[in-house]
């Protein structure tokens, strides 16, 4: 089931959800918020700047420059190139598959719940977020996907690409 919340940004919804968790009793959080690609990265950067420190934020991207420009201290470059996916989900999917061990290691620190946020319709979020969700679920982590899809004016091709990504993501959350 896909639900849309037209009056609120997905990052604001996630901020409100996370604020309800309160402070953990220990320093290492069992909750990870993982931003994948440009859209997911923007959402995580926003939440991080809002001052939520009760979770561990992670950025995953095929674009090394986007990772370096972020204030979020934990990042994972997907693939070896670091030049982005060029709006090609299959390229991002391959980069994520190439980085499976790094993804597993990122999730292996006691993570019990993962929120994976991504913008669908481009390359990295659409292609890599489902791979990260699959790994998370295979590790027994409660995995929640929070994604956006393009506006109608962005065109049918981009929307179709986004819906393919949502369908793939839904298999793992």
Regions found by a protein language model. Give the residues of each.
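Tubulin/FtsZ superfamily GTPase core signature
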Residues: 4, 8-173
């Amino acid at each position: 089931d896909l639900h849309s919340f037209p009056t609120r940004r997905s990052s604001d919804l996630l901020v409100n959800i996370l604020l309800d968790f309160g402070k953990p009793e220990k320093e290492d959080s069992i909750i990870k918020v993982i931003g994948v690609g440009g859209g997911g990265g923007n959402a995580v950067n926003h939440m991080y700047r809002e001052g939520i420190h009760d979770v561990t934020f992670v950025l995953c991207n095929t674009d090394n420059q986007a990772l370096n420009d972020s204030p979020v201290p934990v990042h994972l470059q997907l693939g070896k190139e670091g030049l982005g996916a060029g709006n090609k989900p299959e390229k991002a999917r391959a980069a994520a598959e190439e980085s499976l061990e790094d993804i597993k290691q990122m999730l292996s620190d006691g993570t019990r719940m993962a929120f994976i946020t991504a913008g669908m319709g481009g390359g990295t979020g659409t292609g890599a977020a489902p791979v990260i969700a699959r790994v998370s679920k295979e590790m027994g982590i409660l995995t929640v996907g929070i994604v956006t899809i393009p506006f109608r004016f962005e065109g049918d091709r981009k929307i179709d690409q986004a819906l393919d990504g949502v369908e793939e993501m839904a298999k793992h959350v």
